[in-house]
Each structure stands twice: as C-alpha cells, then as structure tokens.
Amino acid sequence: MRKNRKESTLDIFKESDVIGVLKRGLKQDGWSVKDQVKLANGYADLAADKDGISFIIEAKGEDKGGFSAAEMNFQMGLGQLMARMTDIDKKYAIAFPSTPDFIKVLQKYEASFAFKGLDIYLFIANGDRSYFVVPPKDIPAFIDGNRI
C-alpha cells in the first residue's frame, strides 16, 4: 500500500490544506461535499455523500510543533470523531496529511483494534493534492507498509 503515500510538497500541511485537498478530490470523484456540518455533538469538518454512502470526516493537520503536536492533533481528532459517532448508518473517518510525523503517529496504533472495532476509516491527503482512503480492515497493512 506504500505506493499511495506521497511525500508532502508543502512546508507545513495545515488542517485547512487537508480539508482543501479532500474537498476538491472528493468532488472530482463525484461526492457531494459539505464543510462545517452541524451535528448533535459539535461540527464535523466535512460530510461526503455518494451512492447512499455518507462519511463524516474530522480533519487534522500540522503546525510548527513537529511530532508531539501531530500526536496531540491526531488524538484530539479521534476524540472529536468518537463524540460525533451518533448515526449508525454513517461512516466515520479521520483525515490527516501523509507527512512523516503523522505516519509515525499512526504507527503507535499498529496493534490497536480500535479502527476496525469502531469502523473508522483514514482519509490521507498527499502533498501533490491527491488523496486516498484506507478502510478499517486495511489499516494494519497500511501501517506496516509505511514505516518511518
């Protein structure tokens, strides 16, 4: 799965960059996309709908804090996402950039069954403005193939 991850070409891949990549890419792929969607427990960064499938997406990005900040942002994103998991008919995802710090953070979850158990997808934004999706069942293989 490593072929999908591309090195970032941005100096700092901010949350707004991740959201921008996903909005453009999802729309190009035929998804209906809304941002800042009000839910029962706050706002989701993005909602995407296509062919009867609905995703609620919480996006996180980099700041100048390096690995520690990426780890904190990722964990905060997971908490926000879990608080918004109120509709069993929707799919839920955390989005982040394919930067070394975020990939390294993800490696801490290699032995965790949480993504599969909670059915959480990964939406990963690349520096070339492309994106890809990792389904919950494929996350361990993705982590294993993207060692930093």
PLM region spans:
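Nucleic-acid nuclease catalytic cores
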Residues: 85-128
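Structural signal for conserved beta-strand scaffold positions within catalytic alpha/beta enzyme cores
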Residues: 35, 58, 94, 122-124, ...
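Conserved catalytic cores of phosphodiester-cleaving nucleases, focusing on short active-site segments
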Residues: 46-48, 52-66, 84
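Histidine-anchored nucleotide/phosphate-binding helix
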Residues: 78-86
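Charged, low-complexity C-terminal accessory regions
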Residues: 121-148
